[in-house]
């Protein structure tokens, strides 16, 4: 039982470890930040972290390259100044917008209407990244451009060195991103269901193994029904087959139905904790209901006579004897064998006498004349 509990705990630990590793591996596939590659007029680059919005189009796989323009007004809560007209057809422009004063979707929609291809919204008095969302379905349907969110320090660096007026340009680089609330929660639900099923399966298997082990072991009340004999010198058995120690006077021997005897201290743990069979001949000490039924069926099959039934049947197995009846059975067997020998001797004597009479008759017939011999033979026939 302790071994089964240990195996159950080990299996549960392994399952927990596997699920934990898979969960962390899955979380590693959920980056919360993308990258902004900024290049100044000297082609020096710098990378800034950003967080894509939950509305609008995704960034293209190859990234979005454009020139950065400061929004006018900065909060973009109303229509803003469009990008330069002379370069509008040949270049892509990205607008930098300040947070607060209105919703994110309004800011991005105003940037889209002004002609910008992407929008960057920066935080105020903080470098924390916020996931931009919207509750207005009508506004969401109108937004087509991508947008990202950055911290205030990143926005100040972009304004100082990487704007369009200072000869800089940006590349918004997308990264593999999965919405956490859409993928992690179903994943955790599936993992939880699998874990519950595994635990139920392991508990069921543990209970079945425990019941099976109980059926294969001997109960205390069944053990008490087996006879116990105190060993005396001259008894039939001399060595315990389990501990290989010779029996001494006064040793308590447990006598099994198969007539094998063992020390009580040796065979009792075997019967109650391992199997209810004889350690030597493997015969069951207390047959179960299924065993008795199978024995009855097999005996009925043996009694049925078919075309495959052998002419000479094998000898039936000798029934189990008690420890005290062994000597009587052996003496009875010796007496039976001696009586069989006497009957065989009598039969041999009778057959030899009959053969002697036949031989004497033949001798008499040969000594008589031919006519008389023929007469006697004819009378005999």
Curated annotation (Swiss-Prot):
Keywords: Disease variant, Endoplasmic reticulum, Endosome, Epilepsy, Glycoprotein, Lysosome, Membrane, Metal-binding, Nucleus, Signal, Transferase, Transmembrane, Transmembrane helix, Ubl conjugation, Ubl conjugation pathway, Zinc, Zinc-finger. One of its GO terms (cellular component) is nuclear inner membrane. It catalyses: S-ubiquitinyl-[E2 ubiquitin-conjugating enzyme]-L-cysteine + [acceptor protein]-L-lysine = [E2 ubiquitin-conjugating enzyme]-L-cysteine + N(6)-ubiquitinyl-[acceptor protein]-L-lysine. Residues 65-160 form the PA domain. The chain crosses the membrane at residues 183-203. Residues 285-381 are annotated as: Disordered. Residues 1-34 form the signal peptide. Glycans are attached at residue 88. CDD domains: PA_C_RZF_like, RING-H2_RNF13. GO terms for biological process: organelle localization; positive regulation of JNK cascade; protein autoubiquitination; ubiquitin-dependent protein catabolic process. Residues 292-304, 339-357 have a biased composition (Acidic residues). Changing residue 114 to P: Found in a tumor sample; uncertain significance; abolished localization to endosomes. Residues 35-182 are lumenal. Changing residue 270 to A: Drastically reduces E3 ligase activity. Changing residue 43 to A: No effect on glycosylation. Residues 204-381 are cytoplasmic. PANTHER family: OS02G0798600 PROTEIN, RING ZINC FINGER DOMAIN SUPERFAMILY PROTEIN-RELATED. The RING-type zinc finger domain is required for E3 ligase activity and for promoting ER stress-induced JNK activation and apoptosis. E3 ubiquitin-protein ligase that regulates cell proliferation. Involved in apoptosis regulation. Mediates ER stress-induced activation of JNK signaling pathway and apoptosis by promoting ERN1 activation and splicing of XBP1 mRNA. Also involved in protein trafficking and localization. This is E3 ubiquitin-protein ligase RNF13. The gene is RNF13.
């Amino acid at each position: 039982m302790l071994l089964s509990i240990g195996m159950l705990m080990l299996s549960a630990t392994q399952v927990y470890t596997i699920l934990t590793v898979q969960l962390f591996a899955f979380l590693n596939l959920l980056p919360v930040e993308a990258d902004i590659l900024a290049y100044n007029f000297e082609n020096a680059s710098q990378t800034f972290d950003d967080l894509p919005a939950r509305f609008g189009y995704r960034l293209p796989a190859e990234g979005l390259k454009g020139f950065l323009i400061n929004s006018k007004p900065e909060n973009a809560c109303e229509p803003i100044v469009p990008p330069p007209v002379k370069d509008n057809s040949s270049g892509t422009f990205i607008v930098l917008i300040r947070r607060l004063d209105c919703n994110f979707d309004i800011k991005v929609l105003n940037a889209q209407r002004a002609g910008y291809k992407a929008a960057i919204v920066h935080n105020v008095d903080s470098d924390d990244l916020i996931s931009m969302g919207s509750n207005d379905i009508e506004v969401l349907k109108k937004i087509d451009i991508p947008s990202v969110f950055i911290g205030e320090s990143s926005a100040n660096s972009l304004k100082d060195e990487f704007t369009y007026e200072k000869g800089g340009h940006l590349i918004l680089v997308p990264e593999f991103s999965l919405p956490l609330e859409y993928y992690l929660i179903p994943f955790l639900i599936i993992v939880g269901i699998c874990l519950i099923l595994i635990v139920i399966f392991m508990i069921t298997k543990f209970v079945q193994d425990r019941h099976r082990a109980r059926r294969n072991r001997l109960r205390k009340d069944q053990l008490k029904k087996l006879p116990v004999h105190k060993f005396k010198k001259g008894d039939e058995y001399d060595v315990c087959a389990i501990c290989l120690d010779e029996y001494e006077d006064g040793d308590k021997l447990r006598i099994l139905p198969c007539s094998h005897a063992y020390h009580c201290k040796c065979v009792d743990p075997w019967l109650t904790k391992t199997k209810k069979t004889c350690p030597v001949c493997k015969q069951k000490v207390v047959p179960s209901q299924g065993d008795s039924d199978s024995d009855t069926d097999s005996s009925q099959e043996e009694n049925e006579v078919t075309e495959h039934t052998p002419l000479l049947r094998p000898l039936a197995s000798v029934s189990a004897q008690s420890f005290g009846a062994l000597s009587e059975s052996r003496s009875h067997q010796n007496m039976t064998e001696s009586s069989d020998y006497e009957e065989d001797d009598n039969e041999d004597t009778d057959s030899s006498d009959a053969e002697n009479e036949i031989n004497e008759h033949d001798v008499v017939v040969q000594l008589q004349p031919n006519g008389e011999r023929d007469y006697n033979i004819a009378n005999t026939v």
